[in-house]
């Protein structure tokens, strides 16, 4: 398994990563929801809403959410956009899709169980908007995913994604990251030496270079954002620890110890009983603009 190979200091394969992601998502289905809906920028927008801002309701009507998870983003779309919008979601995890289907059970939304690299059932140039919320970071291999997105995106279509931001750009984030990783490394010494997925997504510069290679002649914008969540130290510690994949490999006993360590950290930084968690993200927006862009493969 992925964890065994990490433990032995070996390099896990793409299949090991997939198996590991399935294990985590089966055990903690919907785990990113709470923190992602709660963390907001200064104008009160969370990361789902930052993606929705990239839609032009006058010219876009067909939206695909790639790695849609438990369906939160599609639920936002369903509430915001008129009934003539065509919404669909793809995810590789059955349990997440079950949650998404039950959340949107009365709606005319298509869900597909598939990997992002294998979307042969979606026609060329058929989607106005493709969203990917917090999942590009975990896709391996990533280049086939980007090529697929380019293939199925219409001319004038938009591809928008939320990915990890710079660790140093949000106050306190690095400290929290380090508390979690140091704790996990006491039990799994090699954990964190190898990141999940493609490391190029984790830096603005390398992400920009990678996307430009695939989407040449398209408009590409990557913007950094810091999203914040205020809560009591205990609540914040629980929510924040569950947002990091690293902490989800722990046994329940160790997990509780980690949560109490985080709670102590938030306690020290609290003001009037409330602490803050600041989350750095990058928003990638690609607009498929030119004829050349859509014709070249």
Regions found by a protein language model. Give the residues of each.
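Short glycine-centered segments of the SAM/dcSAM-binding site in methyltransferase folds
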Residues: 62, 157-158
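Conserved Class I S-adenosyl-L-methionine
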Residues: 2, 6-10, 40-43, 197-210, ...
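Conserved catalytic/acceptor-binding region of the Class I
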Residues: 143, 158-227
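Conserved class I S-adenosyl-L-methionine
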Residues: 2-57, 72-76, 96-99
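Class I SAM-dependent methyltransferase SAM/SAH-binding core
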Residues: 64-66, 70-119
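A short glycine-rich, Lys/Arg-flanked "PGG" loop and its adjoining helix->strand segment in the class I
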Residues: 143-155
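A short SAM/SAH-binding and catalytic strip from SAM-dependent methyltransferases
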Residues: 129-142
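A short acidic, Gly/Pro-enriched loop at the edge of an enzyme's catalytic core
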Residues: 121-130
């Amino acid at each position: 398994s992925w964890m065994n190979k990490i433990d032995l200091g070996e390099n896990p394969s793409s299949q090991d990563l997939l198996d590991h992601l399935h294990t985590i998502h089966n055990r903690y289905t919907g785990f990113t929801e709470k923190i992602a809906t709660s963390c907001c920028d200064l104008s009160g927008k969370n990361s789902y809403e930052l993606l929705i801002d990239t839609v032009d309701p006058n010219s876009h009507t067909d939206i695909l959410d790639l790695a849609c998870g438990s369906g939160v983003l599609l639920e936002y779309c369903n509430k915001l956009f008129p009934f003539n919008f065509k919404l669909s979601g793809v995810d590789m995890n059955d349990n997440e899709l079950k949650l998404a289907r039950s959340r949107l059970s009365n709606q005319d939304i298509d869900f597909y169980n598939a990997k992002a690299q294998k979307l042969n059932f979606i026609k060329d140039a058929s989607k106005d908007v493709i969203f990917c919320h917090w999942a590009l970071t975990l896709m391996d291999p990533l280049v086939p995913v980007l090529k697929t997105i380019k293939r199925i995106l219409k001319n004038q279509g938009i591809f928008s994604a939320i990915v990890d931001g710079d660790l140093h750009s949000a106050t306190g984030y690095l400290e929290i990251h380090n508390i979690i990783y140091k704790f996990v490394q006491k039990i799994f010494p090699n954990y964190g030496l190898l990141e999940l997925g493609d490391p190029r997504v984790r830096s603005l510069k390398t992400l920009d270079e990678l996307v430009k290679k695939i989407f040449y002649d398209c408009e590409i914008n990557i913007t950094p954002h810091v999203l914040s969540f205020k809560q009591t130290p205990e609540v914040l510690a629980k929510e924040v620890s569950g947002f990091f994949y690293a902490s989800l490999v722990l046994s329940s006993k160790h997990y509780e110890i980690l949560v109490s360590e985080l709670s102590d950290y938030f306690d020290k930084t609290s003001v009037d009983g409330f602490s803050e968690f600041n989350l750095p993200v990058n928003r990638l927006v690609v607009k498929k603009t030119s004829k050349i862009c859509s014709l070249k493969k």
